[in-house]
C-alpha cells in the first residue's frame, strides 16, 4: 500500500517545504542510490536508515557491521558510507546509511541526521522547511 504524501515545494533549490501529514509525520519522496523511496523525516535518528529488503533492491552492498540501539531494542545492521541520497529535490552525493530498519513497509526509510544535518531546519506544527546552509 503506497503512502500518500502531500506536495513538497522546492524553491530554486534553496529550500524545500514539507507539509505535515494527517498522522503528524513529515513524509517526502526521494531516491537512494537511484532507487525510489518514501522517507519519514526522523530528526532523532542519527542516520538515514533503510530495510534489508530495500538495500537489496537498491544494490546497497558491503558496509561495516554495527549494532543498532533502537526504541525496540538492539538490532544488528550495516553502515554504508558515501551513498547518494535525494530527498524532495535536494541531492547529496555522500551520505552515511544504516541498513537494518525493521518492521513496516520496506519501501519506507527514515531520513535522519546524516542527511538533515547538512541543512538549516525550521519546524512548526504545519510544515518543515529545509534550507541550504550558508557557506
List the model feature ranges, each with a label.
Residues 1-135:
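Pepsin/retropepsin-fold aspartyl endopeptidases
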Amino acid at each position: 500500500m503506497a503512502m500518500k504524501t502531500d506536495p513538497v515545494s522546492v524553491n530554486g533549490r534553496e529550500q524545500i517545504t514539507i507539509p505535515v501529514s494527517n498522522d503528524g509525520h513529515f513524509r517526502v519522496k526521494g531516491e537512494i542510490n537511484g532507487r525510489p523511496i518514501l522517507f519519514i523525516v526522523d530528526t532523532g535518528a542519527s542516520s538515514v536508515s533503510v530495510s534489508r529488503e530495500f538495500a537489496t533492491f537498491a544494490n546497497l552492498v558491503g558496509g561495516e557491521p554495527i549494532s543498532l540501539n533502537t526504541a525496540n531494542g538492539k538490532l544488528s545492521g550495516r553502515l554504508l558510507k558515501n551513498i547518494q541520497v535525494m530527498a524532495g529535490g535536494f541531492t547529496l552525493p555522500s551520505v552515511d546509511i544504516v541498513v537494518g530498519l525493521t518492521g513496516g513497509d520496506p519501501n519506507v526509510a527514515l531520513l535522519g541526521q546524516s542527511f538533515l544535518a547538512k541543512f538549516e531546519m525550521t519546524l512548526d506544527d504545519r510544515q518543515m522547511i529545509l534550507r541550504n546552509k550558508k557557506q
